[in-house]
Regions:
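A short, compositionally biased domain-edge/stem linker segment
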Residues: 19-28
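Alpha-to-beta junction loops
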Residues: 70-72, 88-97, 150-152, 185, ...
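Acidic, polar ligand-binding/catalytic clefts
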Residues: 63, 67, 72-144
Length: 219
């Protein structure tokens, strides 16, 4: 995929000047030769839906893989926490959902070589000045670590941001005193931030930028 330029083209479609390509899922049919992909289509620009079609980096890659294998593509959209488990239970063939490689997940699946290095982003209200003086990630972390138990931080359930707040020995996160409030997707977390349901939101950088841009354009 990398050697023939397909991966770069897919990245350009979703991160650059290209156009995201619609990916259709066939209906599951055990009589056919199908590639069944588990995902959680709540994570733009990696996997998301518009109407009945799937879009995003992982979904375009899934379509390419199915075509190379000569199989019909079936996409099963499920809760994020069930994605790896569904492969481990042989209900799906592969999982593609913006997954962070972790030892816990290796109990269920074998990972490919990593193809994207993600980072986390903190989303705050425009009127919040708590982090205005921060000049580095260490400055941000120092404030996050000083937050007390009464503070609430929104995140997408089961993601790296969730693990960062609650703590994870596997990923090397000591955790915060602030309470993690997990949502089905990052957009719901940010909406609750606007509605004063949480104080901050921590999610992956790519979806954070898309969500913040969309919210600001609506304001």
């Amino acid at each position: 995929m990398k050697s023939d330029g397909t991966f770069d083209a897919i990245c350009n479609n979703n991160f650059g000047s290209g156009t995201p390509q619609a990916v259709k899922s066939a209906v599951l049919d055990k009589s056919k030769d199908q590639l069944i992909v588990a995902t959680n289509a709540e994570f733009e620009p990696f996997e998301y839906m518009k109407g009945e079609n799937y879009y995003g980096v992982d979904m375009e890659m899934a379509a390419y893989i199915a075509k190379k294998l000569g199989k019909e593509l079936v996409i099963k959209n499920m809760n994020f926490d069930a994605v790896c488990l569904s492969v481990g239970q042989h209900k799906c063939d592969i999982a593609m959902a913006g997954l962070t490689i972790s030892e816990d997940r290796k109990e269920y699946v074998n990972f490919s070589d990593p193809y994207y290095e993600a980072s986390q982003r903190l989303i705050v209200k425009g009127t919040d000045t708590t982090f205005d003086a921060c000049k580095s990630a260490d400055d941000v972390n120092a404030i996050l670590n000083s937050l007390t138990e009464d503070k609430k931080i929104g995140c997408q359930q089961g993601t790296t941001g969730n693990s960062f707040i609650e703590g994870s020995n596997d990923l090397g996160f000591p955790g915060l005193k602030a309470k993690a409030v997990a949502y089905k997707n990052g957009s719901l977390a940010v909406q609750d931030l606007i509605n004063n349901g949480v104080d901050y939101v921590i999610i992956d950088a790519a979806p954070a930028e898309r969500i913040a841009k969309a919210i600001n354009e609506m304001s």
